[in-house]
Swiss-Prot record:
Its main location: secreted. Disulfide bonds join C53-C71, C60-C75, C70-C79. It is found in: Secreted. It comes from the Eukaryota. Omega-conotoxins act at presynaptic membranes, they bind and block voltage-gated calcium channels (Cav). Residues 1-22 form the signal peptide. Belongs to the conotoxin O1 superfamily. This is Omega-conotoxin-like 2/7. The presence of a 'disulfide through disulfide knot' structurally defines this protein as a knottin. It comes from Conus imperialis (Imperial cone). InterPro entries: Conotoxin, Conotoxin_omega-typ_CS. GO terms for molecular function: calcium channel regulator activity; ion channel inhibitor activity; toxin activity. GO terms for cellular component: extracellular region; host cell presynaptic membrane.
Amino acid sequence: MKLTCMMIVAVMFLTASIFITADNSRNGIENLPRMRRHEMKKPKASKLNKRVCIADDMPCGFGLFGGPLCCSGWCLFVCL
């Protein structure tokens, strides 16, 4: 009996928290497809797509310390 009451209270609490934290912006769902189309026309480069590398003939550290690697992928004290 106690377990059933606890389950009912937990479900009510979770349901209330979902409604409280829900987005209350007006026409938020209706504007979503329009925003997606706009984003596809002008995609923003993410940090994962950006390539940070060291140019040729510049000193490199073999990538041991988490720094940028050579653009060519070859390092022998200088980028090759």
